[in-house]
């Protein structure tokens, strides 16, 4: 292990990033032909299958910037996986709804994601998972304070 690798291994942010990249790559390899990326899977699963989901609620649920989400939604629309529906009572509200094909892919994405989740939980002890959840929750709380000056 070289000096950079030794230093990087001890940096929390790098470990989180590296783990996420490996999970992302693994999931994408498993689903790229059917679904596309993990981001696509998460968007499809965020959308209520019966009523759709208000477009303004999707980005915060996913932790995405609105601009990134807009590009992703446009791509999903072009692939005919989702469509936009305006609220009949309040025209300012726009809902993203799943097409029939979008619903099929949502179900595939959910199965694959829960399969990945199960494989992780099968290999990691409950104690270690609890510690992981505690640490990640604490990290999130550190950076969700109201003022950037608090960091």
Each language-model region and where it sits:
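N-terminal helix-turn-helix DNA-binding core of bacterial DNA-binding proteins
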Residues: 25-68
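N-terminal positioning helix adjacent to the helix-turn-helix/winged-helix DNA-binding module
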Residues: 8, 12, 38-40, 101
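Charged, amphipathic alpha-helical coiled-coil/dimerization segments
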Residues: 24, 74-134
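Single conserved hydrophobic/aromatic residue that forms the stacking wall/gate
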Residues: 146-151
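N-terminal leader segment of winged-helix/HTH proteins
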Residues: 1-34
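DNA-binding alpha-helical recognition surfaces that contact promoter or target DNA
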Residues: 71
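C-terminal regulatory/oligomerization modules of transcriptional regulators
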Residues: 1-5, 127-145
């Amino acid at each position: 292990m070289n000096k950079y690798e030794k230093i990087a291994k001890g940096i929390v942010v790098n470990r989180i990033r590296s783990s996420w990249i490996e999970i992302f790559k693994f999931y994408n390899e498993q689903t790229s032909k059917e679904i596309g990326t993990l981001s696509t899977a998460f968007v499809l699963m965020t959308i209520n299958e019966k009523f759709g989901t208000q477009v303004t609620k999707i980005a915060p649920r996913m932790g995405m910037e609105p601009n990134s989400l807009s590009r992703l939604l446009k791509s999903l629309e072009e692939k005919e996986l989702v469509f936009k529906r305006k609220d009949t009572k309040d025209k300012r509200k726009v809902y993203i709804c799943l097409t029939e094909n979008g619903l099929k892919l949502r179900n595939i994405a959910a199965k694959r994601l829960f399969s990945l989740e199960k494989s992780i939980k099968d290999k990691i002890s409950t104690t270690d998972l609890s510690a992981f959840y505690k640490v990640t929750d604490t990290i999130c709380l550190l950076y969700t304070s109201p003022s950037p000056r608090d960091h």
